[in-house]
Amino acid sequence: MGQTVTTPLSLTLEHWGDVQRIASNQSVGVKKRRWVTFCSAEWPTFGVGWPQDGTFNLDIILQVKSKVFSPGPHGHPDQVPYIVTWEAIAYEPPPWVKPFVSPKLSLSPTAPILPSGPSTQPPPRSALYPAFTPSIKPRPSKPQVLSDDGGPLIDLLTEDPPPYGEQGPSSPDGDGDREEATSTSEIPAPSPMVSRLRGKRDPPAADSTTSRAFPLRLGGNGQLQYWPFSSSDLYNWKNNNPSFSEDPGKLTALIESVLTTHQPTWDDCQQLLGTLLTGEEKQRVLLEARKAVRGNDGRPTQLPNEVNSAFPLERPDWDYTTPEGRNHLVLYRQLLLAGLQNAGRSPTNLAKVKGITQGPNESPSAFLERLKEAYRRYTPYDPEDPGQETNVSMSFIWQSAPAIGRKLERLEDLKSKTLGDLVREAEKIFNKRETPEEREERIRRETEEKEERRRAGDEQREKERDRRRQREMSKLLATVVTGQRQDRQGGERRRPQLDKDQCAYCKEKGHWAKDCPKKPRGPRGPRPQTSLLTLDDQGGQGQEPPPEPRITLTVGGQPVTFLVDTGAQHSVLTQNPGPLSDRSAWVQGATGGKRYRWTTDRKVHLATGKVTHSFLHVPDCPYPLLGRDLLTKLKAQIHFEGSGAQVVGPKGQPLQVLTLGIEDEYRLHETSTEPDVSLGSTWLSDFPQAWAETGGMGLAVRQAPLIIPLKATSTPVSIQQYPMSHEARLGIKPHIQRLLDQGILVPCQSPWNTPLLPVKKPGTNDYRPVQDLREVNKRVEDIHPTVPNPYNLLSGLPPSHQWYTVLDLKDAFFCLRLHPTSQPLFAFEWRDPGMGISGQLTWTRLPQGFKNSPTLFDEALHRDLADFRIQHPDLILLQYVDDILLAATSELDCQQGTRALLQTLGDLGYRASAKKAQICQKQVKYLGYLLREGQRWLTEARKETVMGQPVPKTPRQLREFLGTAGFCRLWIPGFAEMAAPLYPLTKTGTLFSWGPDQQKAYQEIKQALLTAPALGLPDLTKPFELFVDEKQGYAKGVLTQKLGPWRRPVAYLSKKLDPVAAGWPPCLRMVAAIAVLTKDAGKLTMGQPLVILAPHAVEALVKQPPDRWLSNARMTHYQAMLLDTDRVQFGPVVALNPATLLPLPEEGAPHDCLEILAETHGTRPDLTDQPIPDADHTWYTDGSSFLQEGQRKAGAAVTTETEVIWAGALPAGTSAQRAELIALTQALKMAEGKRLNVYTDSRYAFATAHIHGEIYRRRGLLTSEGREIKNKSEILALLKALFLPKRLSIIHCLGHQKGDSAEARGNRLADQAAREAAIKTPPDTSTLLIEDSTPYTPAYFHYTETDLKKLRDLGATYNQSKGYWVFQGKPVMPDQFVFELLDSLHRLTHLGYQKMKALLDRGESPYYMLNRDKTLQYVADSCTVCAQVNASKAKIGAGVRVRGHRPGTHWEIDFTEVKPGLYGYKYLLVFVDTFSGWVEAFPTKRETARVVSKKLLEEIFPRFGMPQVLGSDNGPAFTSQVSQSVADLLGIDWKLHCAYRPQSSGQVERINRTIKETLTKLTLAAGTRDWVLLLPLALYRARNTPGPHGLTPYEILYGAPPPLVNFHDPDMSELTNSPSLQAHLQALQTVQREIWKPLAEAYRDRLDQPVIPHPFRIGDSVWVRRHQTKNLEPRWKGPYTVLLTTPTALKVDGISAWIHAAHVKAATTPPIKPSWRVQRSQNPLKIRLTRGAP
């Protein structure tokens, strides 16, 4: 027997319970694993002599403690609880440690201690450290601080203090001071650390009757000492640690350490909290701490006395020299720590945890600590809890670096790995990773290799092209030279043939040319130049350009250098220009002819005009050719000069081609604005800081960095960089480098990433970087846009200010800084090995493309220029984002204001563009307008943009045109009316049909734009006049201001009225037009007085509007807007010029609007609401609608006072209003040609007939939203019936009257009759044969011989006088007429045979239909539409599945999905043995052929042998080439079942259901979602469930039931003896003989049973089911012809797969019957009748 060595570490582990109790007394917690790790691995590395087995030496422990408590990054806060516990064990050793601890030495005290004796003077008191006078009672000379049982509330006071050198407060007694000085003078002053250590071991002085509440320390022999907080400590703690709101865990750990080591009093705790926490944080901590107070029962209490006693908010009177006072203080600290922990717990936010990802250079252990800290901070879960280990492990895997996470996911047996195992694996992967230097070297090497390969490939292709062209050119030269020789010599002369040994040079025999002595040797001379075209003259990529004359154009966004060839009929492109058209042309060249294709039309914008051209694509041509076709369109001129040919435009300018967006096209037509001559010399030199050319990049010095707030639910988005061409990357590289040098771009690492888009600048090869920030914009909070509206911005510019300065700020957004917390939002990917950049870059300034950038910059610039506006009130300063306009009344004021503005902009840090500046001019361009002399014009560039657009061919092109022209609508009178035919074509889903009306509107808009007048700038000091006119629902007007005796137009306004207003009479439409245009004009007038002039006296209409036309809401709106006399006034009635909308010199004929409206009555002028004296009839109408037994019944009636004239039931669901309209309409129809008084109690019917009917008709029976009104058909019928009576009076009466007047009696009778009629059975509206419809005329019946034979068999009689047969009293309809009638009815309804038969029987047709039922059946069966949609009723008999003859020979396979799955398992691969029913199931992560093959070879084959047959559905994992190849190699017959026929795989499909049902029950019973763990139990049930023969799969396979133990039988002796191996073998032999063979015979007998085949034969036409139908798609497709059949499946023409018979139905082919058809002819007055197939 050996002996074990006891070490301090092993001793603590053996008494681990005591160690945890001691740690708990210190208010800390320790873990055994970390205890061992720190003792054996961490602390020995500190270099203080700590052994790996631990020690109880206090000197070594204190040195380790000083290392642990080191401030800054060198400290180890996580090790504080463990070293504190070690110190407590060593300082006050428990019994099992005392034999290993050396005895303590008694040292004299050197530190200040508590007064030990009574003092004659009271101690001084301070606000921070109060003094307490305890009650006089006997106490021991040595106060016992620690109890004998080592209670948990006292050990907290035994911690060592930090090494503070400050001395405690001196005694207030002078004698005491002298005595202390004497004592200290005798002993040399040691270091502060030694003083503190010795002080803990010195005996205490005599008892004191007065104690001070100072931070306490327990020295040697129970002596109490005080060590106050120093201001430097508090300062360092506050500044070297994050705030509580930022990182509550770290600050809580600091406070816990301070409470443990410094032992502060109640006042010190308040000082500490007040320093480290804000007021709100402190209140929250105190509240949470008071919630943690526990009562006597150990549960949290809310009793105020207990809460205040344990955790007081005011200074308590605790005496710290007594155990009771110190226990109160310890409890207070514990509650304070609990409050800190509870207050620091953030709301649950798993998104924050998910956002913690591993950094590129972060170790897995450090990442795990950050992840655990996030769990503690943002979730209520403890990451150290074993129950949460799975969640933490998954987060660790998924949020690790991609390279580490992917490898961790592929670990074998992942679910059995602990978190420590995953960290160790991650550490291995991390340590083997590629360093940044190695990665950069690899990228550089790969780039060089790729570039070398590309260069070698280019050179090889170049050589190959040179050789090919050399051969072609040689052939061409040989052909030319031979032709020339033939022409000179007049015939063909061949070179004489040489002999085998004859020299080709000297023609002598005996040697060859290479050995000829007469052949000159030496270096070869220069090649003679030829005038013919050689290979060196050909142009291509990387070669010299074509010879002169040449011109470079941009085609398809790429510059192409053309050779100007006036001999070429068509222009030619050699490179692939994009899509080619179907047209082609035959090109004849020197080497033969060939056909080439044309390109599609290319739109080219030139300074000379717009050209749309199609080029000829000839790849074999040496150069791109500019032929006569394009030269003609360009109107090019070729001048031959001494230096060569020059190609210019019609005006002598060089030809240039640009491609740009249509919104910027007007810039092409603008004349270049040259900077002022004085700008370069004076303005640039005087204000260098204001210009971008001299001052560099701007920076708004007064604006703080911007913080971009995100939406609450936003998460980082990462989009990969789009592929970028080499040319584009080189184009934006200088811009990226420039922005990096200026500090606008900086490298970063961010979870956000958006792609960078290179945009080519028009007409150049330069690119500019544009970032796609659409996804970022979706996740950023929206702010209200405050950017000024260009529509009314110039309204603030008075016409008196006619000197202007326009400044365009350069890179305006880059002047605003971004806060560092918001910079990661705009990160993008950029790699440049040459610059050493490979990663992400982000913006430090406000980026372009961000949705809030214009608003943020506009607001910032407005704030910065606010002082300038105040200091210069005489100047007008307009700002639209980065475009600034300064206006003054004189040139001098403009110059002075411009200087002040430039100085201000330079001081503020903004930079203007000197190239675009317009300084002190009387005519400037601003926001696309031309400003001059107080007026604004459309620039010619804007006009040319609209004029140059081609005729739109798509809705998008039309919207572009209307948008461009709509910008100029203020200059176009009646723009809304002109563009009215165009707007309907822009709607989505509308057919784009460009007709004459659209072409006319298109031309009118262009023509109006050419004649656009100059508009005056609004002068807000003068009143405005608005001339309004209305025509056909369109409001038109012109806003003017007086300029002397003239009226100067300010804006032309136009708008379309809404559908309700468009249906009013003309005078009311004028009111609506004035209201609409007044609202639009208010945007320009800014609330200034407005005088309205119109051809109608509308003021009286507005004050007293007619109630029958306007609703109350609309009337109130109009009156509130137009009767505001302070702002709106009405002028006299004027006649307007329809062209200019200005008043005519002569006055028009006046009219009274109120009189006209009064005359505008209903549809019938003589309609009245007073009874007619000489009426022929006086009737009463009523409609009724009510609910009875859950069904709405309705009826209508017309009565007199005493009798019912008409009453009828209406269809179910009819409303009361509709019934009233029907009753009134019926009365008017019956009184046709007579004088009628009709009474109705319906306000709706009365108002419709008198008022609203005409209003509805005028506006097209539409509501204000443009929808159809209710009861449209009934209203139209009523309006039509109003004209039937000779005279008419519709009178309204009260309903449900009780009097005895004639009116009351008639109304009651009408109401009663309507209710009685409603109760009756309503007419069947679904009846197909309508009685009112015109029937067939029997005289036109034509009977065939077959019809006559059937009629004679029926016994029908022939009516000689009428010419038709009669049967059962009805005319007999011939078979052909019956077929046409029933076929038409079926095409209207597509009802089935039974329903159509029932409706025909119910309809009581006046004719007897010959062979009706048979014809009806044929019509329903032969309908193609019904065959494609209706479901099939055909049923196929059940088939028989083929089974194996023994276990393991025939398997069925299937995948089934089981969600949710842990560890990535979400599929289940199921194998079923068809013979025994034995089930094997394997959880998988993917549904692939690789998984199927792997399980087949590794699981099925080793255990059951090689299968002979496999059956499965047509899933991709089974039909894959991998699966089929494995089956072919192994000789397995793989049978694929019919698609969408689960019954074909019925056995495995049924077992899938059984397994999933069992798993569901097991998960519910076990309370877990890990179905993989419960799968064996589900398989056990499936394998032991009896089959159709009463045997379980286990019994069939093993010959006995599974071994079970009866736990209820106490006698286990019978189960202890197991049978021998021989007995098992005999049993299996018996099973094979007695079970397997009969079972196989039973399966074979089922196969021999006859199967009822399907009715389809070869050659039949069938419809095939469409299994995946889309919206409104027919259910069946076809018909198809059957090619092959089996008892259960078919193969049809056009579909490669076999189709199960249950998925088809027969297609009935209707016979071709001759019938008459009507066809159109070229002559509109003629039609053609043909007889043929229907």
Curated annotation (Swiss-Prot):
Coiled coil: none annotated. One of its GO terms (cellular component) is membrane. Residues 112-217, 433-498, 512-551 are annotated as: Disordered. The modification Phosphoserine is found at residue 191. Residues 433-474, 485-498 have a biased composition (Basic and acidic residues). A zinc finger (HHCC-type) spans 1386-1426. Mg(2+) 2 binds at residues 1182, 1220, 1241, 1311. It catalyses: DNA(n) + a 2'-deoxyribonucleoside 5'-triphosphate = DNA(n+1) + diphosphate; Endonucleolytic cleavage to 5'-phosphomonoester. One of its GO terms (biological process) is establishment of integrated proviral latency. This is Gag-pol polyprotein.
